[in-house]
A protein has these predicted regions:
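Pre-Walker A adenine-sensing motif
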Residues: 1-11
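Conserved P-loop
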Residues: 15-78
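Walker B catalytic acidic pair
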Residues: 122
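ATPase catalytic-site recognition across NTP-hydrolyzing enzymes
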Residues: 181-246
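Short beta-strand scaffold segments in enzyme catalytic cores
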Residues: 252-257
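Conserved small/polar residues in nucleotide/adenosyl-binding loops
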Residues: 282-289
Length: 289
């Protein structure tokens, strides 16, 4: 929360990105840090508090944030009709406008305003156009960007254009895990770890930007020899089935299976991708498994 303070080796960074697992303290740390920074560095300026929707922003951020600020001697007054939070402490007063970035049209709502900084809570849920418009509004000298999110897929625009270019953009990047949240008891952390599997475990618990593809059946990737039949399939006997995963715009896949009791072996397959292959082309491959 104090990376921006005098004496910090990263105080000149243009902003901060915090990603990682759920319940790791990202929202609390960044929202409080954002307000402490803005109230220490500016007075009479406009700031943006951005969430997926204004309702989720009020529910997930503002409630706890106002309590923490009040405990530190700040006065927080909210004008709900204007979607505005006014913070005061002594002679310092700043204005925090609430914005929802739920779709492409949301960028129109933030146009025109001049900002001294912006906080993006769950930025990975927002469209890129909204984030680009909001960051373009931060033209006051000394303004900074504050981002937090849970991971999505590896090709997500925020991972590629912001996390992947954090050094070029002079942004501080922090990765959070549940171990960073000292308020979570060991039983609660154990419950979360047991609650998810596959891609959801990788994203929510380990905080990794992973794709669902290839993780639907992770046990196959982890123990491939248990699922590959070595040798020839010639003369194999059993009940034969043809599986079809039909697609026109998406790939079409058909397979010839031999089922013996509880074991099913895919003998041959036909695969067609209309986006990659000529219309007249059909690929048939025999598995020597």
């Amino acid at each position: 929360m104090t990376w921006w303070c005098d004496g910090s080796p990263v105080r000149d960074a243009e902003g901060i990105i915090a990603d990682g697992s759920i319940r790791s303290g990202k929202t609390v740390s960044l929202s409080l840090g954002f307000c402490l920074w803005s109230m220490s560095r500016f007075s009479g300026q406009n700031f943006a508090l951005c969430g997926k929707t204004i309702a989720s922003l009020r529910r997930n951020v503002l409630g706890g944030l106002k309590q923490m600020l009040t405990a530190r001697g700040y006065t927080a007054a909210e004008r709900r009709g204007d979607n505005l939070l006014i913070l005061r402490r002594g002679s310092v007063e700043n204005y925090y406008y609430l914005f929802g970035g739920k779709d492409e049209a949301s960028q129109d709502l933030i146009q025109g305003i001049t900002l001294a900084g912006a906080l993006f809570d769950e930025v990975a849920l927002m469209p890129e156009s909204f984030v680009n418009q909001a960051t373009a509004r931060c033209s006051v000298a000394g303004s900074k960007f504050w981002f937090n999110c849970n991971p999505e897929g590896p090709e997500h625009w925020f991972r590629k254009n912001w996390i992947g270019r954090a050094s070029d953009k002079r942004l501080l990047y922090l990765h959070f895990t549940m171990e960073d949240n000292l308020s979570l008891t060991p039983p609660i952390k154990a419950r979360y770890r047991a609650q998810y599997t596959g891609v959801f475990y990788e994203r929510y618990i380990r905080g990794r930007w992973v794709a669902a593809q290839g993780l639907v059946y992770p046990f196959v990737a982890e123990h491939p020899d248990s699922y590959i039949l070595r040798g020839t399939t010639a003369g194999m006997d059993g009940a034969f089935y043809i599986s079809i995963d039909y697609g026109t715009h998406n790939p079409c896949s058909m397979g010839l299976w031999c089922v013996q009791r509880t074991v099913a072996v895919r003998l041959k397959e036909s695969y067609y991708d209309s986006r990659a292959l000529p219309v007249s082309y059909t690929h048939l491959r025999a598995h020597e498994t």
